[in-house]
A protein has these predicted regions:
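Membrane transport/envelope proteins' first extracytoplasmic loop
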Residues: 2-278, 290-293, 309-310, 348-349, ...
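Small-residue-rich transmembrane alpha-helices
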Residues: 278, 282-297, 321-353, 361-388, ...
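N-terminal Sec/SRP start-transfer signal
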Residues: 1-34, 291, 308, 317, ...
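Juxtamembrane segments of multi-pass membrane proteins
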Residues: 53, 59-65, 413-540, 544-547, ...
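Interfacial "coupling" helices/loops that link adjacent transmembrane helices in transporter permeases
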Residues: 12, 16, 266, 282-322, ...
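C-terminal transmembrane helical bundles of large multi-pass transporters
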Residues: 497, 614-621, 630-733, 738, ...
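Short coil/turn motifs that cap or connect alpha-helices
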Residues: 151, 308-309, 390, 556, ...
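Short cytosolic juxtamembrane segments of multi-pass membrane proteins
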Residues: 3, 388-404, 779-792
């Protein structure tokens, strides 16, 4: 008995092999998404953990104004401290040799005279660490070195106390502090074009800095759970040395950005496989439901021959599981390659110190099991329906339904036949349409992600930052200096800029960011409203927040906030209580905005800035003059930063290249799923109607007319499915968008007309293509044999 059902199973699989293959492809894509995404996710988490552990990444960092190096020994004796290191960290201007960008912002980080530091050790990628002694040598952080094409033996020129000092590059290194080479929490975006880290031996630099025998930063590795307590105790104990608030590992800028990326990665790793595997289950259910109806006579015969309901149930479940097994095998192989690709792309982007790539067989097994479960669940409904049939009911066939209302409406024959077939079994038609709608959901999802990314970049680069040239000064001058720049040839407009690092306190929550002063009516820095998109300007005593920062701090319009300058000292400090205004739509970064004059009066004056002091300028320049204006600024000793809008755009596009790669792969997978789903839907309809179409051929219908009938029916189902999937697709896209917002990048959902057109038209086109294999089969039918087949 079992052998006979096994023989029938093999014959059924052979007869519907392409439908089984199509279902397996959908399931396989889901498994590939699950295995590949989670493999990449797991490898990145492990790579972070291994890099942090091997290089002793600091659990807590405390900045100091100046303290004797002897405090390092005292701190090492505190309970809970495992490793401690004291060092000098200084930001300064760095000049480069001809052929490279003229001047950048550098950060000097000192190393012990001979060995690796006890905390935040370095991995040498090329060359060696500085030796120390009489020779002035430096090792460069890898992303900065790669961007500016530094090799061991090259020279670099930091400016120490206003003097240009030559250092020889001895090595290229990777640091756990600068996996993402970000300058601070206020400037939470990697900018290797304009910011680099130089590691030098302490004995080579401390006298030049006037800091001999001193440290201004202490880093510690602590026992688990002790970082907050120890950091706060050090801050309190050494407040006489200007100790700052401790920065834990979770708050460290590079790690903050890395963890934000991982948090944004996780929802896609869950949602995308779920969508694919759910669609596979639906496809199995649709195909087997039609098979069960087409095989009612066979089921009745088997039941009459003594086969129990459990055997019938198992038989149809095995059909679904066979499709799931095929999908699982394909998906594991494809997912492994996908996981390797993700790991490689991410490693190339970040220059991870230790890149760990493991196959994670437990994920492969889980993915294979999910494929079996999804397809098994999809088969369960039709299998139970078949098992519940009594022999007499099954062999009698279905009783024709009473004439429908649509049947009484006079319609042309070529329209009446397909419409009758659709309305005769509305639930089955709806199920098929839902299968097509699933592909519409995925097409909207992937298309809208690309649309939203492009729209976000346009908003940031063309509206928020609408300048041609950004200039940052070494020391804040008064804004009167801008009158001089306005007279330069090619300069069309100059606007002042004042940016200060601040800490926001609200209802027990705090966040460090940068506060930017905005000129009323500014044309070069616009603040589009989140709700209307129209430019806004902060009222006096009010600050405008990005929508991402408002959500993080749980802010509402009108909330009172304490905003303090982060580098307050006994000599200079500034803070104010201000109210929050309406949210600004800014996709990149989380700054806050205040009126320029308001910022100068409330913060600039208390901090000792010149009257109407500024930290930079924004310029609009005629295209033919941009290079010369940039060169003039780079030649000025009072200018620390010069950046064109094209350079900013290039940095941002480089950062988003990883996301674009993901979205492109999602779109390819989505197109493959859409084709597979529409093929199963259309081909199962053709299998079900084989006898009817063969009868039409014997009545004189040519294949041309039959093709039109089939195409009309399938197009109606496809159009219904596309319409069904439209709204859920938008909701799923919005949910994924909300779940994947990161610390540095927050997009607003945008669905372009092209995406709507693609999502609506693609299922119709795919259905049209997917029906041709079935039509070719019908054109080659043995008509007499087909008509003798037992229909429903």
């Amino acid at each position: 008995m079992v052998n006979r059902l096994r023989t029938k199973l093999i014959r059924d699989v052979r007869a519907g092999i392409w439908q089984i293959v199509a279902i397996s492809i959908v399931a396989g894509l889901g498994v590939a998404m699950f295995y590949g995404l989670l493999m990449g996710y797991s490898n990145q988490k492990i790579s972070y953990a291994v890099s942090y552990q091997r290089l002793r990444f600091a659990d807590v960092t405390i900045g100091l104004k100046r303290a004797p190096r002897a405090i390092v020994q005292r701190i090492s004796g505190m309970p809970g401290v495992i490793h401690v290191d004291g060092r000098l960290v200084v930001d300064l201007d760095v000049e480069q040799s001809p052929g490279r960008r003229g001047r950048v912002t550098g950060r000097l980080v000192t190393l012990p005279p001979r060995d690796q530091p006890a905390v935040n050790q370095l991995l040498v990628l090329e060359g060696r660490l500085p030796i120390g002694g009489a020779r002035r040598e430096a090792a460069l952080e890898s992303s900065f070195a790669a961007r500016h094409k530094y090799r061991p033996g090259d020279r670099i020129f930091p400016k120490l106390d206003g003097q240009r000092v030559a250092f020889t590059v001895t090595g290229i290194v990777s640091s756990p502090e600068y996996i993402y080479a970000v300058q601070s929490k206020q400037l939470l975006m990697p900018t290797p074009e304009t910011f680099g880290v130089l590691f030098v031996r302490r004995d080579q630099i401390e006298s030049l800095l006037g800091m001999a025998g001193s440290v201004n930063e202490v880093t510690l590795v602590t026992e688990p759970g002790q970082a907050d307590r120890i950091g706060e105790e050090i801050r309190r104990r050494y407040s006489a040395y200007g100790s700052q608030d401790p920065m834990t590992r979770a708050e460290q800028p590079s790690n903050l950005l890395l963890q934000s990326d991982l948090d944004g990665y996780a929802p896609a790793a869950v949602l995308m496989p779920t969508l694919f595997l759910g669609t596979a289950a639906l496809a199995v259910s649709l195909v087997l439901a039609r098979w069960v109806q087409a095989q009612r006579g066979q089921v009745g015969f088997l039941r009459a021959s003594g086969f129990p309901p459990s055997a019938i149930l198992q038989h149809y479940l095995e059909l679904g599981i066979a499709a799931g097994a095929g999908g699982g095998l394909v998906g594991v192989g494809l997912g492994y390659g996908y996981g390797l690709l993700i790991s490689k792309v991410y490693a190339d982007l970040l220059h991870m110190p230790y890149q760990i790539v493991e196959p994670h067989p437990e994920l492969a097994v889980a993915g294979f099991g999910l494929s079996l479960v999804a397809c098994g669940l999809g088969a369960l409904g039709p299998a139970r329906q078949a098992a519940a049939m009594s022999p007499a009911e099954a062999m009698r066939g279905q009783v024709p339904s009473s004439p429908m209302l649509a049947a009484r409406i006079p319609l042309p024959l070529m329209l009446a036949l397909p419409l009758r077939n659709l309305l005769r079994r509305p639930l089955r038609t709806l199920g098929t349409a839902v299968g097509v709608g699933a592909s519409t959901i995925l097409l909207i999802l992937t298309g809208s992600m690309l649309d939203s990314l492009d729209a976000s970049l346009r908003t940031y680069l063309k509206e928020v930052q609408n300048y041609d040239l950004l200039v940052g000064f070494s020391e804040p001058p008064a804004d009167g200096i801008l009158f001089h720049f306005r007279r330069w040839p090619g300069v069309l407009r100059v606007e002042p800029s004042l940016e200060l690092p601040v800490r926001i306190l609200h209802n027990g929550r705090s966040e460090e960011t940068v506060m930017i002063g905005v000129l009323p009516g500014s044309q070069l820095r616009r603040l589009p409203s989140l709700d209307t998109g129209l430019p806004m300007f902060p009222l006096p005593g009010t600050v405008l927040f990005t929508d991402a920062l408002m959500r993080k701090l749980n802010l509402e319009r009108g909330n009172l906030l304490n905003i303090a300058y982060t580098q307050n000292t006994r000599e200079f400090s500034a803070e104010a209580n201000l109210r929050s205004g309406d949210p600004v739509h800014q996709p990149i970064g989380t700054p806050i905005y205040i009126g320029l004059r308001d910022l100068q009066l409330r913060y600039g004056v208390p901090l000792g800035l010149p009257p109407r002091g500024i930290t930079g300028a924004l310029l609009r320049v005629e295209p033919g003059y941009l290079a010369s204006v940039r060169a003039r600024f780079q030649a000025r000793k009072d200018v620390a930063l010069v950046q064109t809008s094209d350079e900013l755009a290039a940095q941002i596009y480089e950062l988003t290249a990883y996301s674009r790669t993901f979205m492109g792969i999602f779109m390819l997978f989505g197109a493959a799923m859409a084709l597979a789903v529409t093929y199963t839907a259309t081909d199962s309809i053709l299998w079900e109607r084989t006898r009817e179409l063969a009868t039409l051929r014997t009545l004189g219908f040519g294949m041309g007319r039959i093709s039109i009938l089939v195409a009309l029916e399938n197009m109606m189902v496809a159009a219904l499915g596309a319409a069904i999937g439209l709204y859920p697709g938008i909701r799923v896209a919005q949910g994924l968008m909300d779940a994947t917002q990161t610390e540095g990048f927050a997009m607003k959902l945008v669905v372009s007309q092209q995406t709507y057109l693609m999502a609506l038209a693609a299922p119709v086109v795919l259905v049209f293509l997917a029906q041709w294999p079935g039509l070719r089969r019908i054109s080659r039918l043995d008509l007499a044999g087909a008509i003798r087949l037992r229909d429903e």
